[in-house]
């Protein structure tokens, strides 16, 4: 009769719960026999259809009124009690020996509904004995008794149906031994605050009258009466009220799911008085559910149980289990499938829909510690507002190992793509062909990728300009010189395609120190005179070079170190022409035409010479103090141009131009005569 109670509508559909209507009819019949009762007030307060129906005030009024009119009610309730006991005995199979006391209360109008309830049972305890308790001579109805206990009106003059000294309870200790596991969790302790006398000891009682089938909250007693006898059976028999017959109005303060022998008494204990020789311990191996009408649950409660009332009836028909680890008809060792399948409607107030329940099943010492957790699906991560133009390279032959940084940019840390000679490994973002382009200037090659506040990728120049000035870098500042940052992948000198050096542009600091270093550095190499045909390996460095290392080499990872000097063989017999010319700066230029070579000794990559192994070059070295510059201008011979410039700050290589796809910024002879004015942009591209 309770399974149709709604769990989320506290006031709108109360009429679907027959308990409210039956209690109203019963209380109305009680109050009609009283002369001094304010009949209109109680009828209005008992009307469950009133929207502002106050349960607490209603209960208190009933309790106060029952305290004053207890004796008048007993005569009327005794006749109803006899009728109820006779009907109950027919339904449950127990004999009516006039020993029921006040088991049925005064709610005789709903005794016909007892057929919906199965025989009384205890899910984990088998009935063995039945102890008949004589009827108390001066008894009260359970309703009156509960109201008195609820309002703390436990007067010694008022007798209870359990205050007979001859009453005794035989407790089988085989099912009382406590175990180590507990299956409970706390709920809202502030739901309907009020007096609590469940565990208050009463004199001359074998056990507390309210501790057998009540909650820690005392408010449930006046609203819902028990329909099964409580006073004449032992625990081994079927005196434990079923979950469908004794409902708590308010969620108990300490537990909703409890492991107790009593379905509705998770923490009840027998007072150690009278003939009782042992306390009643909780059976932690059994799981019992306190059925609470959902329409009485407050929104502050932690858990609401929407649909498990349908399963309570099936639970009440479950055969008796012998295994202490098998609550209901299943064991928790099977993964909690029964509970997950039948009780998946446990929701929190903030949840719109029930979430799946997961069990952590790890039996320990033949006991189970099942932790019930309502798994809330984590909301997916918010989609980033950043618009990224990063596209993943689908070339599996390269198989790069990428790393996603915290900002979302993809950095290739290891790649099998190398240059044409197979030397070197791409180890930087400038070398990875990931398709990343600057959203401002559109460049795809930069020593350092940056991001704007929106998360879009920017090159180092645009990103640093935005960081320093706070505005977007104007495209007018972007010149063709910035394309010299690119490093070609087709050069045959073995240069690493991923080095982020600055060999094409010299910063002011390295240029200012050029004059301070006289010899042995990359800008002013000292000529080394050796025998003809001597082969220099790039792994063996000259003593002068090993002693001093220029600032330029520290900043740029100089491509000069990667020069394969083993390919350099200059013979004096092959020099066919030595001519001296004058450049625009009136500096002598000596062209050494290296003939007889079908292909240049350097392939496609010109570079500076740290040392020349030809005596012929050493003859003209005395006239040239500035760095030598080598250019492979044609395929039939190699033109080595040694250019002395008065503008030392404008020194650059043709390598910077030949790696470009359009060869912008280079003249026909391959010699760059650009001045320092073209290097004003360089401060944007330096790594500080």
From Swiss-Prot:
GO CC aspect terms: nucleus
PROSITE patterns, per the entry: GATA_ZN_FINGER_1 (PS00344), GATA_ZN_FINGER_2 (PS50114)
Polar residues bias: start-end ranges: 369-379
One example of a Gene Ontology biological process annotation: negative regulation of transcription by RNA polymerase II
Domain of life (superkingdom): Eukaryota
Keyword hit for DNA-binding: no
Keywords per UniProt: Metal-binding, Nucleus, Transcription, Transcription regulation, Virulence, Zinc, Zinc-finger
Compartment(s) of residence: Nucleus
Zinc finger (GATA-type): 438-462
Skewed-composition ranges (Low complexity): 259-271, 402-428, 488-510, 529-543, 552-565, 639-654, 662-678
Compositionally biased region (Basic residues): 382-397
Primary subcellular site in the record, as a coarse category: nucleus
Induction section of the entry: Expression is induced by rapamycine.
Biased composition (Basic and acidic residues): 359-368
Keyword presence, Transcription: yes
Pfam families, per database record: GATA (PF00320), GATA_AreA (PF08550)
One example GO MF annotation: DNA-binding transcription factor activity, RNA polymerase II-specific
Chain intervals for the UniProt region annotation (Disordered): 83-125, 259-278, 343-438, 482-565, 639-678
Function: Transcriptional regulator of nitrogen utilization required for nitrogen catabolite repression and utilization of isoleucine, tyrosine and tryptophan as nitrogen sources. Controls expression of the MEP2 ammonium permease, the DUR1,2 urea amidolyase, and the transcription factor STP1, which in turn mediates SAP2 expression, a long-known virulence attribute of C.albicans. Influences the filamentation process depending upon the nitrogen sources available. Required for virulence in a mouse systemic infection model.
Protein name per UniProt: Transcriptional regulatory protein GAT1
Organism: Candida albicans (strain SC5314 / ATCC MYA-2876) (Yeast)
Gene name linked to the record: GAT1
């Amino acid at each position: 009769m309770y399974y149709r109670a709604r769990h989320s509508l506290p006031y709108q559909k109360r009429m679907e719960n027959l308990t409210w209507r039956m209690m109203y009819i019963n209380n109305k019949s009680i109050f009609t026999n009283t002369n001094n009762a304010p009949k209109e007030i109680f009828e209005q307060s008992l009307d469950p259809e009133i929207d502002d129906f106050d349960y607490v005030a209603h209960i208190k009024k009933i309790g106060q009124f029952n305290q004053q009119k207890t004796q008048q009610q007993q005569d009327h309730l005794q006749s109803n009690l006899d009728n109820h006991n006779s009907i109950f005995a027919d339904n449950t199979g127990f004999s009516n020996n006039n020993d029921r006391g006040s088991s049925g209360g005064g709610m005789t109008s709903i005794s016909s509904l007892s057929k919906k309830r199965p025989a009384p049972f205890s899910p984990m305890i088998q009935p063995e004995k039945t102890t008949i308790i004589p009827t108390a001579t001066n008894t009260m109805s359970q309703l009156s008794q509960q109201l008195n206990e609820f309002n703390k009106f436990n007067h010694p003059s008022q007798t209870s149906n359990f205050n007979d000294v001859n009453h005794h309870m035989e407790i089988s200790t085989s099912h009382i031994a406590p175990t180590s596991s507990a299956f409970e969790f706390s709920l809202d302790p502030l739901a309907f605050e009020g007096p609590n006398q469940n565990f208050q000891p009463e004199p001359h009682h074998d056990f507390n009258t309210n501790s057998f089938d009540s909650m820690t909250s005392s408010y449930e007693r006046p609203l819902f009466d028990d329909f099964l006898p409580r006073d004449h059976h032992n625990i081994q028999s079927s005196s434990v009220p079923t979950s469908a017959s004794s409902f708590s109005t308010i969620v108990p303060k300490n537990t909703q799911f409890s492991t107790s022998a009593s379905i509705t008494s998770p923490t009840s204990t027998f007072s150690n008085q009278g003939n009782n020789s042992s306390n009643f311990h909780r059976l932690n191996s059994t799981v019992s559910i306190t059925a609470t009408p959902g329409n009485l649950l407050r929104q502050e409660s932690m858990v609401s149980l929407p649909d498990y009332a349908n399963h309570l009836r099936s639970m009440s028909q479950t055969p008796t289990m012998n295994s202490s680890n098998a609550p209901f008809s299943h064991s928790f060792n099977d993964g909690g499938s029964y509970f997950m399948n039948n009780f998946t409607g446990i929701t929190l107030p903030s949840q719109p829909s029930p979430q799946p329940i997961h069990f952590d099943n790890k039996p320990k010492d033949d006991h189970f510690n099942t932790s019930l957790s309502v798994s809330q699906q984590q909301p997916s991560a918010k989609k980033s507002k950043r618009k990224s133009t990063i596209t993943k390279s689908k070339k599996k032959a390269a198989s790069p190992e990428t790393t996603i940084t915290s900002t979302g940019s993809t950095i290739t840390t290891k790649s099998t793509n190398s240059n044409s000679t197979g030397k070197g490994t791409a180890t930087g973002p400038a070398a990875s062909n990931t398709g990343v382009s600057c959203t401002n200037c559109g460049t795809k090659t930069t020593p350092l990728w940056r991001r704007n506040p929106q998360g879009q990728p920017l090159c180092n120049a645009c990103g640093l300009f935005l960081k320093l000035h706070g505005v977007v870098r104007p495209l007018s500042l972007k010149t063709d010189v910035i394309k010299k940052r690119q490093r070609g992948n087709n050069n045959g000198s073995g240069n690493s395609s991923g080095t982020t050096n600055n060999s094409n542009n010299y910063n002011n600091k390295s240029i200012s120190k050029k004059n301070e270093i006289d010899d042995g550095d990359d800008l002013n190499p000292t000529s080394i005179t050796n025998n003809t045909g001597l082969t220099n390996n790039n792994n063996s460095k000259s003593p002068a070079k090993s002693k001093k290392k220029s600032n330029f080499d520290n900043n740029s990872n100089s491509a000069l170190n990667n020069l394969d000097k083993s390919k350099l063989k200059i013979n004096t017999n092959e020099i066919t022409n030595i001519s001296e010319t004058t450049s625009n700066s009136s500096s002598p230029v000596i062209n050494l035409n290296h003939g007889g070579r079908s292909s240049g000794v350097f392939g496609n990559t010109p570079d500076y010479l740290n040392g020349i192994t030809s005596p012929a070059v050493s003859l003209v070295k005395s006239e040239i103090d500035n760095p030598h510059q080598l250019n492979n201008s044609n395929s039939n011979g190699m033109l080595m141009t040694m250019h002395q410039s008065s503008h030392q700050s404008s020194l650059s290589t043709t390598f910077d131009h030949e790696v470009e796809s359009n060869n912008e910024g280079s003249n026909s002879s391959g010699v760059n005569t650009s001045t320092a004015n073209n290097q004003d942009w360089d401060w944007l591209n330096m790594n500080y």
